[in-house]
């Protein structure tokens, strides 16, 4: 595996490989890689002749400078994981490489980007779309892989691809969890042992809510989750929404949509964790 730091060098490598007829898969990441990322990389390796994994902590998607400063940076360990997964290239550019000038582009995909994360993290999805579009332009992948844990992000990127007419396939990949159910996240590294134990209440509550939902209304299920998280030690609920999986708009009845997802964000101590669960899926 090669580690590449400039767009020019990456494009030179990819041009030669495309001339051999190879398809290119892209896995955008911010590093601090774990088994969830590995599942995306392995999927790409299985479906493409060449896999590029970007490792870049994108400053424009952080609306909290403290969160940006604390985000784990572990490039050497990341490269070892990527090599083990069969990636061809780790693309680890500098901020100056990706943003030689400030990016003033405004991306708006309302109502997808105005609810949930969009409401609580203003500017976040604009930053996500800035960097993802830059990566798409630099790599020109045939397929790009994103995890379903960032459910809203995946929906917004699909819409960006549709509106900007990118000629690529977006592949959503299932959430990867620890054996005890905790959704894998780079931020889990910041949890103390006690906080990690408390964080288990998030996934456990979501799993219970899926069973609960089979015999209760949407509003009853919403209340059950909110009360369970509020009663759990060391957790502070930011939001829990039960939404249409395509439009991300709230549903009031299970009959409102064939695709219904519960999306949650919880603070465990100072660490902000997200998760989701599918109640109905086509």
Curated annotation (Swiss-Prot):
Pathway: Cofactor biosynthesis; (R)-pantothenate biosynthesis; (R)-pantothenate from (R)-pantoate and beta-alanine: step 1/1. One of its GO terms (biological process) is pantothenate biosynthetic process. It catalyses: (R)-pantoate + beta-alanine + ATP = (R)-pantothenate + AMP + diphosphate + H(+). GO terms for molecular function: ATP binding; pantoate-beta-alanine ligase activity. Its EC number is 6.3.2.1. The active site is at 37 (proton donor). It comes from the Bacteria. Beta-alanine binds at residue 61. It is an enzyme of class 6 (ligase). ATP binds at residues 30-37, 147-150, 176, 184-187. Keywords: ATP-binding, Cytoplasm, Ligase, Nucleotide-binding, Pantothenate biosynthesis. It is found in: Cytoplasm. The reaction proceeds by a bi uni uni bi ping pong mechanism. Catalyzes the condensation of pantoate with beta-alanine in an ATP-dependent reaction via a pantoyl-adenylate intermediate. Homodimer. This is Pantothenate synthetase. It comes from Bacteroides thetaiotaomicron (strain ATCC 29148 / DSM 2079 / JCM 5827 / CCUG 10774 / NCTC 10582 / VPI-5482 / E50). The gene is panC.
